[in-house]
């Protein structure tokens, strides 16, 4: 989805801190945001690191029977076997990782989306394959409207 976003001219809406994209062929829709704050640490010290695109998304892909899938890319390869910890106003969830991508377990997508609709911010904490700890904080202002738009566009 992020590659599609980068190459897409199909931005159809923006809702405060979230954007909505929709592609027609194949039909895919997603709500996406970039972090408001990023902190990278190694051995407890703040470090400057190069990262690719960082984005938190909710994806809808009717052909693949995907409806409201949480997807995160941290802009680097995650440590093998690690998880991304998601904290939304005290509620904690884990995303599983593969390479530069992370997803919720299928049963958790709806729970995370519900928490995001009620919350003000989401903090995602992860570890790179080089041992860097990253903390990305996303605003949830406009999340509900963006997710509802993406869902409707892909019905």
Language-model region placement:
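A generic "folded-domain core" signal
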Residues: 2-155
């Amino acid at each position: 989805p992020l590659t599609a976003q980068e190459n897409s001219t199909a931005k159809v809406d923006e809702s405060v801190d979230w954007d909505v994209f929709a592609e027609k062929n194949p039909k895919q829709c997603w709500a996406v945001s970039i972090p408001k704050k990023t902190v990278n640490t190694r051995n407890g010290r703040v470090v400057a690191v190069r990262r690719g695109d960082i984005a938190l998304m909710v994806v809808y892909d009717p052909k693949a029977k995907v409806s409201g899938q949480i997807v995160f890319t941290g802009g680097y390869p995650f440590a093998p076997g690690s998880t991304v910890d998601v904290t939304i106003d005290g509620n904690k969830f884990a995303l599983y990782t593969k390479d530069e991508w992370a997803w919720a377990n299928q049963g958790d997508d709806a729970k995370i989306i519900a928490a995001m609709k009620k919350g003000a911010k989401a903090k995602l904490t992860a570890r790179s394959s080089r041992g860097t700890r990253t903390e990305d904080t996303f605003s949830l202002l406009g999340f509900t409207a963006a997710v509802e738009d993406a869902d409707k566009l892909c019905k």
